[in-house]
A protein has these predicted regions:
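C-terminal regions of proteins
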Residues: 205, 210-218, 223-274
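Active-site-proximal loop/helix segments of hydrolase catalytic cores
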Residues: 5-24, 113, 140-220, 224-232
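Short, small-residue-biased leader/transition segments that mark boundaries at the very start
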Residues: 1-3
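Flexible, acidic/histidine-containing loops and adjacent segments that form or flank the divalent-metal
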Residues: 19-171, 243-246, 250-274
């Protein structure tokens, strides 16, 4: 593998990388991830935590989710001779048409301070089943997401947002678990984020997009990675996205593969463009 990107240090995103790095048949040349050490320098850290070790504390967020004896993800990558780089707005890969459109260093700094506090979020469990039955107007769809607060997780807000453009006029916007503030910041710093094929943030949660943001992004295709509960994906998110494009979800289609080749069995949208 030429490059791997860990968008943020939540267990459902970082966990699989430990297996990859411990697999002798897998070679990763480059690893992109962000940690508080990138933006919190020694003097600031010592004022906040005079009795702690800056490097180990800043990397705690990338500890193994369950194995306390494992190296953290950064040290494990370095021990495997991976080149580890921070990924902030403006970074462009030297050989692959992929660039970082968020977060900026300034946006990430206050989030890094919160991450160091080791804030633990309650796990968002929901075992109800997604359904799109019954009347659901455009007004209802918008209010069901716009009246909700922004995702307050600092790790989600600090997600790396990537833009992949393999050919002209074919763009993929990969939003990780970015929240509304992060996506707004990315849009303000980049002029070419509309009309992309987007990976919808945070499993289609109603706390990570608004109807206004969706209209600004105006995606030509929306893909959600979700288990198909009432919250993930949000019915309101799906409806607002479908004003612009077909909406796909892994809970309906399984693994989704985008290809430029002709296909005989295309994936079935969760909701077709309205």
């Amino acid at each position: 593998m030429c490059i791997r990107d860990s968008t943020h240090p939540d267990s459902d995103h970082k966990g699989g990388f430990f297996g990859l790095l411990n697999d002798r048949d897998v070679i990763i040349n480059e690893f992109w991830l962000n940690t508080p050490e990138d933006v919190i320098k020694e003097d600031e850290y010592n004022r906040l935590y005079p009795k702690r070790n800056r490097l180990s504390h800043c990397r705690e967020c990338y500890d193994h989710p369950t194995d306390t004896d494992s190296l953290n993800l950064i040290d494990l990558a370095v021990s495997n001779k991976c080149n580890v780089y921070g990924a902030y707005c403006g970074k462009i890969h030297s050989h692959i048409p992929i660039s970082v459109v968020g977060p900026s260093l300034d946006f990430y700094h206050p989030l890094a301070i919160e991450i160091l506090k080791n804030n633990k979020r309650r796990k968002d469990e929901d075992n109800t089943i997604y359904n799109d039955i019954g009347y659901f107007s455009s007004v209802q769809a918008k209010s069901s997401i716009d009246d909700e607060p922004d995702d307050c997780s600092p790790t989600n807000a600090g997600s790396i947002i990537l833009l992949f453009e393999p050919i002209t006029s074919c763009k993929f916007l990969l939003l990780g678990d970015a929240n509304r503030a992060a996506i707004t910041d990315a849009i303000s710093n980049n002029t070419n984020l509309s009309g992309c094929r987007i990976k919808v943030p945070h499993h289609g949660s109603k706390h990570n997009l608004t109807s206004v943001l969706i209209d600004k992004l105006a995606p030509c295709c929306a893909i959600i990675s979700a288990k198909g509960s009432r919250k993930h994906p949000s019915r309101g998110i799906v409806h607002c996205l479908s004003n612009h494009c077909n909406v796909y979800s892994t809970h309906k289609s399984g693994t989704l593969i985008h290809t430029s080749y002709p296909i005989t069995t295309p994936a079935i949208p969760l909701k077709e463009k309205q």
